[in-house]
């Protein structure tokens, strides 16, 4: 699959946010929102440890912050670029927010190999496959760089 310069930049921003999360003491994940028109709108890191909120995964933080700062309508039809494959909770949150496309770097297996457990084995595409309206899910964009970030490199 080939990606545009904006898509590559969006994933790079998500990986940079993952590095920032690690430096802050959080699990190294980040996410970027790109509008339906192709504009990069927002970037968010994981904030589970720093907030004490087990739901503060990067994708959920992204949805919350965009809703609060830009309005929920900016989420509809947009794409999320995630440094790691979104979990079931994040996949559901993105669906309910109206996200139409999810692109991730490191797969669930990559994450398990790099970080260990706990593991919720439901993969993003499996969670979203029966969704109506459909949500497109793609993986592997900048995978090696994201895996290196997960491993602390």
Language-model features, listed with the residues they occupy:
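Zinc-dependent deaminase
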Residues: 1-21, 86, 93-153
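Conserved hydrophobic/aromatic pocket- or pore-lining residues that grip, position, or stack substrates
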Residues: 14, 30, 62
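Short, flexible loop/turn motifs enriched in small residues
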Residues: 24-28
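Short beta-strand scaffold segments in enzyme catalytic cores
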Residues: 29-38
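A short, polar/charged loop-to-alpha-helix boundary motif
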Residues: 50-60
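Immediate flanking context of iron-sulfur cluster ligation sites
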Residues: 72-85
């Amino acid at each position: 699959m080939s990606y545009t310069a904006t898509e590559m930049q969006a994933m790079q921003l998500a990986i940079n946010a993952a590095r920032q999360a690690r430096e802050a003491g959080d699990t190294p994940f980040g996410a970027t929102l790109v509008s339906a028109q192709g504009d990069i709108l927002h970037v968010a890191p994981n904030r589970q440890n720093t907030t004490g909120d087990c739901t503060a995964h990067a994708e959920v933080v992204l949805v919350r912050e965009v809703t609060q700062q830009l309005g929920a309508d900016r989420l509809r039809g947009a794409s999320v670029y995630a440094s790691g494959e979104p979990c079931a909770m994040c996949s559901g949150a993105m669906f309910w927010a109206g996200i139409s496309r999810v692109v991730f770097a490191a797969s669930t297996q990559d994450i398990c190999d790099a970080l260990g457990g706990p593991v919720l084995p439901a993969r993003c595409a499996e969670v979203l496959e029966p969704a109506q309206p459909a949500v497109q899910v793609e993986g592997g964009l900048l995978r090696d760089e994201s895996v290196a970030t997960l491993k602390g490199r």
